[in-house]
Amino acid sequence: MKNSVLECRELTKKYGKKEVLHSLNLKLEQGKIYGLIGRNGAGKTTLLSLLSAQNPGTQGEILLDGQKVWENQEALKHIYFSREINPNSTVYSGLKVKELLKIAAAYLPDWDKEMANSLIHLFHLDIKKRISKLSKGMTSMITIILALASKAEFTFLDEPVAGLDVVAREQFYRILLEEFTESGRTFVVSTHIIEEAADLFEEVIFLHEGEILLKENTQDLLEQCRYVSGKTEDVERAVQGKETHGKEVLGRSQGVMVRLKPGEKMEHTEQVTLQPMSLQKIFVSLCSGEDETI
């Protein structure tokens, strides 16, 4: 499958009266690494579970190359969601790591046993252990192995580095990038460790309170955003007419994020300081509730 597109249209999910996702429209193209970023409870896991048909939506539709995904086994061969493993769940009661991997090999049509074995060796994972006895870091290693060895064209990972030490996290980022370069698969990585993984993401998706704040090329977004600081009156004068977010006030001083439109420029003056912003700082500013043109 080449140049495939996975998309959702007006996707809504409710649990009882609580709306977790609200009328989402999202298009994922093959051959990209997406970062899915949001606060706890933003709906990230729910979105990934819906896109992979592990969970039905309340309204809307999910399509792979124009074909509905729900109960479509042919389409689902190309999608895999490696979700967080809860070792205390009855699903894994008494199950050993090697048994889970055997189930995955039988269930996933493109399972790469050689890659799975290579990752087991890299992570020094004891496959004879029961999943209920594993640490958080070890269960994260299993989700990584399942995701990468699935060879699914659209692969979703939910907080894959949770509980991993810095060495193991760097190993994961390197392996993910190598696999992406070699295969051209699409990866969606949900993570709270934004800065560490930022260089991996070709595009970022900011999810906030069940809605998509933005979907943007990472480098373009970093170039669009600047942090402007100085005396309040100087800052307000400098950002007049610009889109601003995340205003911070300290006494007579002020700082604010400016997001420039294509072709729009920020004039340099001695009265204010302009600084580039990290992906994490941009996300925090956009979620702050401030959204205005001064």
Short names for language-model regions:
Residues 6, 21-23:
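Conserved structural motif at the start of ABC-family nucleotide-binding domains
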Residues 34-39:
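The feature captures the beta-strand-to-loop junction immediately N-terminal to the Walker
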Residues 52:
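Helix-to-loop junction immediately C-terminal to a conserved catalytic motif
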Residues 59-71:
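Conserved ABC transporter NBD signature motif
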Residues 74-77, 83-142:
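ABC-family P-loop ATPase nucleotide-binding domains
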Residues 155-159, 164:
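Catalytic Walker B motif of ABC-type/P-loop ATPase nucleotide-binding domains
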Residues 173-260:
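ABC transporter nucleotide-binding domain
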Residues 246-294:
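C-terminal coupling/interaction segments
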